[in-house]
Amino acid sequence: MKLAFWRTSTKAEQENISAAVAPSGGGIIAALRRSLAPEPDWPALEEALILSDAGTATARVVIDEAKGLRDGDGTTRLRSVLLKALDDGANASPADVRDPSVILLVGVNGAGKTTTAAKLAARAQSAGGTPLLVAADTFRAAAIDQLRLLAEREQVPVIEGRPGGDPAAAIHDALTAARVRGLSPVIIDTAGRLQTKHGLMDELAKMRRVIEKLAPDARVEVLLVLDATAGQNGLAQARGFDRAAGVDGVVLTKLDAGARGGVALSVCRELSLPVRWVCVGEGSRDLL
């Protein structure tokens, strides 16, 4: 068993991921390898995991579990524990952009929700779907313009919210249009918000209620778009958004931008959330 996005990616896509993260992750991987041979240097391994943004608590648990195993060398034991920690959050169905009929993207400002929405639409379209994009970030007029341009590039229809208006109204219009026109999935871009702003987080809960009321039979997937450069703040984001909107999975962005990505380990281990997709570039095909 592997990560949700890894299980369904092709060999070429896996190679693209490895190539994209090599510049930023190579030093961490080298440190892990040095600490594993010939005998495990457990304190050095713990430090390497912390430097990868896995967090102190997660790093300590991983090392303690690896030390407790009896079968295999240090590399085998550490790999086993890491994969288990990641897979505990990936036990849901494999990432398939055609499967959920409604995808709600949430996250803080600048995480990459708008571009991720367009990438998901392109992915769905190439897989035979008929996606509909929804510009429900009504706080930032530029976000509506950006999604419109991306939708035109991918030749995907888009429903736009009114600047300053109620995003739930845009979602209502989109779900109605999708039902009439037979479009799926409906991919909703929302405004960025801090997980500490309770009023804005309550708005996300309202959006989910609207979706469940208008499309009671739809399979809804709430995806947290998480900037891999956020470090351990990403774990706090995941907790906050999960409480407000019931997050089903994570899209890890900017892995090609100097990120170590260890926060994914903390999110998977502590919240049991699968990493559905990773973004390793700006192109529509850089969602894997």
Model-predicted regions and their roles:
Residues 1-105, 120, 126-133, 153:
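Non-catalytic terminal/linker segments enriched in charged/polar, low-complexity residues
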Residues 83, 87-288:
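P-loop/Walker A NTP-binding module and the surrounding RecA-like catalytic core of P-loop NTPases
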